[in-house]
Amino acid sequence: MLDNSFYTAEVQGPYETASIGRLELEEGGVIEDCWLAYATAGTLNEDKSNAILIPTWYSGTHQTWFQQYIGTDHALDPSKYFIISINQIGNGLSVSPANTADDSISMSKFPNVRIGDDVVAQDRLLRQEFGITELFAVVGGSMGAQQTYEWIVRFPDQVHRAAPIAGTAKNTPHDFIFTQTLNETVEADPGFNGGEYSSHEEVADGLRRQSHLWAAMGFSTEFWKQEAWRRLGLESKESVLADFLDPLFMSMDPNTLLNNAWKWQHGDVSRHTGGDLAAALGRVKAKTFVMPISEDMFFPVRDCAAEQALIPGSELRVIEDIAGHLGLFNVSENYIPQIDKNLKELFES
């Protein structure tokens, strides 16, 4: 186990953990003691009909959701709903390569985990800890959108509403190549040592390279041309790296990022229907608003729209934002108001 203050409540905000026991993985591995970190807001009502699940995205935790999306002035209103954000397996807070006490799966030996494994684990936690068997809604961004799609395809009778934001039900070839490049940024660092480093600081050069790759692709070309980084209080394009992305990514655990990236690469709900994506999405019963971000270079509108057309009764709600994919961090003034408007309408449906 490695010490890394980035993955603590002091940095990420309060959370709890719960063990769901032995989890057999789709790829054949096993996590003997699978425990998940989660954070909640609001009160579960008597008939347990007001629960909203928020899965987490690549490199992220519940923190951004609680800081930017949840509040009595937002659609995700804890005075109305019981909101639970469950950190995905391998994200640094839930059981992960660097925090497991099981030496057989620590560090480079941590098994490959699929999106489906996360959803099965989340379902088990919700039942075990709260007695929740149905969800008012699932809302997730990026890899959280992948998990949202998995929920509504795997458990179509358990989810009443869904909002996948800036993500797809089946990963695209472009994103597969991009995530492979993300992996190479850290794997090429000699300090990575095949995943058996003794501190994330030994992989500083690789983590910095990953930060720079996110700067190039995570923010759109318009974000840079219009100097939209000024809204973040930054003084130059160089400070986007030096004062924002570099400190963020250089605090992270490399094996955690690799585990997340493999999962992202292999996200595909059509595994439930023999590779037939239309059949998989045709199973969805939840009222679904698909919300791509207009300038997203990972999950462009046309990819999300093509999937939305396969979901019965769904709607395409494009979020207009020049920030691109990292607009998920609430970079632009008009971002959260659009999210809130769409979610409020979805929740009232």
UniProtKB/Swiss-Prot annotation:
Q: Which parts pass through the membrane?
A: none
* Active site: residue positions: S142 (nucleophile), D296, H325
Q: Which cysteines are joined by disulfide bonds?
A: none
Q: What's a BP term from Gene Ontology annotated to this protein? A: biosynthetic process
What is the main EC category here? Answer: hydrolase
- Give the AB hydrolase-1 domain ranges: 60-329
Q: Does Manganese count among this protein's keywords? A: no
Q: What is its EC number?
A: 3.1.1.-
Which GO molecular function entries does the Swiss-Prot or TrEMBL record give? homoserine O-acetyltransferase activity; hydrolase activity
Note the Pfam families from the entry.
Answer: Abhydrolase_1
Q: Which InterPro entries match?
A: AB_hydrolase_1, AB_hydrolase_fold, HAT_MetX-like
Q: Which UniProt keywords apply?
A: Hydrolase
Assembly and partners? Homodimer.
Q: Domain text from the record?
A: The 3D structure excludes the ability of the enzyme to bind homoserine and acetyl-CoA, indicating that it cannot function as a homoserine acetyltransferase.
Record function comment? Esterase that catalyzes the hydrolysis of 4-nitrophenyl acetate in vitro.
Regarding protein family, the annotation reads:
Belongs to the AB hydrolase superfamily. Acetyl esterase family.
Q: What is this protein called?
A: Probable esterase Cgl0839
Per the UniProt record, the lineage of the source organism begins with: Bacteria, Bacillati, Actinomycetota, Actinomycetes, Mycobacteriales
